[in-house]
Amino acid sequence: VWFDRDVLRLNYDGRGEELGEFQSEDQILVVQPNGDFYVTNFDLSNHYESDILIIEKFQPQKVWTAVLYDADQKYCYLKRFQLEASGRKQNFLGENPKSYLLLLTDEAYPRIAVRFGGVDAFREGLEIDAETFVGVKGFKARGKRVSNYLVEAVEELEPVRFATPSEPVAPSTAEEPEEPEATDEAQSDADLLDEITGQMKLFDK
């Protein structure tokens, strides 16, 4: 099955992006830039919207890693999750329409570079190993705060670890308590000293 972005339809003729071989029970995953996602069958009569970020054969065990700006909390968060097979649109960014996606990857062991900006531009950036930074939760979970500082940009780095076919990633089933507002495990010792001496200020986006 192929997807032709020019006409926003599927075909069996090799036009556009190859989505793979499909059996009768297989489905297609569609992810949009605003965090909406849904699945469809692979009927050639399907017509898709133009604002598609990802379209691919749905793999229910695939783990996604997202970095997003949470408009409710006014901080950037990193979350890892699996998507559900639903024909109706669901959203992994939350209910606030002002939240937005900064990065989405299906790399098994992604590394994320974080650069600070504004009044925090002088601070050294972070390099986050997403797999050890936060566990796999449901797509509605908030995730873990990247930093208390003003994040200007995030970038996916080349991975240094790779998954093997015999190495599935199991989601955590334990409930994760809400993190304390002052906690930031990604801070350096110097940043913690700033907090202790009262020199650090928090800035909303």
Model-assigned labels for residue ranges:
Residues 1-205:
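C-terminal interaction appendages of subunits in large macromolecular complexes
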